[in-house]
């Protein structure tokens, strides 16, 4: 994937609240145009209503302005802007060294079960459909999963405890590995990290490498560093960890994995990728993006997209995460 310096324009993502504005508009505007529109929105804020027709009129006006006015030199060629609720403008920090993707989401197709596929302009499929599972899915009928069109599975191999920091193997990893292989489903693994130092991240990588050797696992998919903030109210050892340290932990884990002969990858939401990880430092490591939407306007490079946490797949009781792997 080549770098896109965005020399023609800044990218503006219009994220509109469901109660006031619906839809998402991407605009190419120079900096003074952005200022003018933001001023207009501020003046109009008091008159906005929940009427969908009025909201769409505002969107149409902004789109028309973006398309008709000349765009010359942007104030910052690597800046990405977001409209938040149609009023406030959030400026993404410039990410030196980050790569951009060339995916055309207008060519994304979704079937009745929410299974997605991305195509190129020649009609060729450029994605593969997959799931990620852990002990939460419990017993899985992998033959039924295969018959439902699943081409790959990312298996949780282990995790580090929120509070104790103890390294643990996912209790369903071995049976999931055996079942997926028997069904001829390509497999990769992810480790749920709570590392707070580079040394701990390297320890996690060594733990994963040891388990892969012990189970004689042959992987067709990456080994993923999955660092997430706890979602419950229990105290976590990762509280207060800086983005720089988190980036260093990811780097340490992925370097170890690569040295062992596996393909590394890191998992992240949009907010974590942009505002915590240094994507420039990690530009040689593929990103597994998590965004639960019908499509994604994420401009930076990613290889895998987790688009749903409430998917339905034959052979699995309950819900499961759905993904597509985008091939070059």
Role assignments for model-derived ranges:
Residues 217-328:
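Surface-exposed substrate-engagement region within the catalytic domains
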């Amino acid at each position: 994937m080549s770098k896109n310096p965005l020399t023609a324009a800044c990218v503006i993502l219009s994220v509109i609240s469901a109660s006031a504005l619906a839809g998402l508009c991407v605009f190419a505007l120079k900096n003074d145009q952005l200022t003018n529109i933001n001023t207009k929105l501020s003046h109009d804020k008091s008159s906005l209503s929940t009427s969908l027709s009025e909201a769409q009129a505002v969107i149409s006006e902004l789109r028309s302005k973006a398309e008709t006015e000349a765009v010359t030199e942007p104030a910052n060629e690597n800046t990405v802007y977001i409209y938040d609720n149609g009023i406030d403008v959030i400026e993404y920090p410039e990410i030196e060294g980050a790569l951009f993707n060339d995916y055309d989401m207008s060519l994304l197709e979704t079937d009745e079960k929410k299974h997605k596929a991305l195509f190129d302009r020649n009609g060729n499929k450029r994605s593969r459909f997959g799931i990620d599972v852990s002990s939460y899915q419990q017993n899985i009928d992998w033959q039924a999963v295969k018959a439902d069109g699943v081409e790959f599975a990312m298996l949780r191999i282990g995790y580090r405890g929120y509070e104790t920091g103890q390294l643990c193997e996912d209790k369903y990893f071995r049976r999931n590995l055996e079942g997926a292989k028997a069904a001829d489903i390509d497999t990769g693994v992810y480790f749920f990290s709570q590392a707070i130092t580079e040394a701990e991240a390297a320890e996690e990588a060594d733990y994963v490498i040891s388990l892969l050797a012990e189970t004689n696992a042959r992987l067709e998919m990456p080994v993923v560093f999955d660092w997430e903030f706890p979602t419950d109210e229990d105290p976590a050892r990762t509280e207060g960890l800086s983005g720089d340290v988190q980036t260093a932990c990811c780097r340490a884990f992925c370097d170890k994995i690569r040295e062992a002969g596996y393909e590394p990858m890191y998992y992240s939401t949009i907010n974590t990728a942009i505002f915590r990880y240094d994507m420039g430092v990690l530009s040689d490591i593929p990103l597994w993006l998590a965004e639960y939407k019908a499509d994604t306007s994420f401009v930076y490079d990613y290889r895998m997209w987790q688009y749903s946490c409430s998917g339905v797949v034959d052979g699995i009781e309950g819900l499961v995460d759905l993904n597509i792997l985008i091939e070059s």
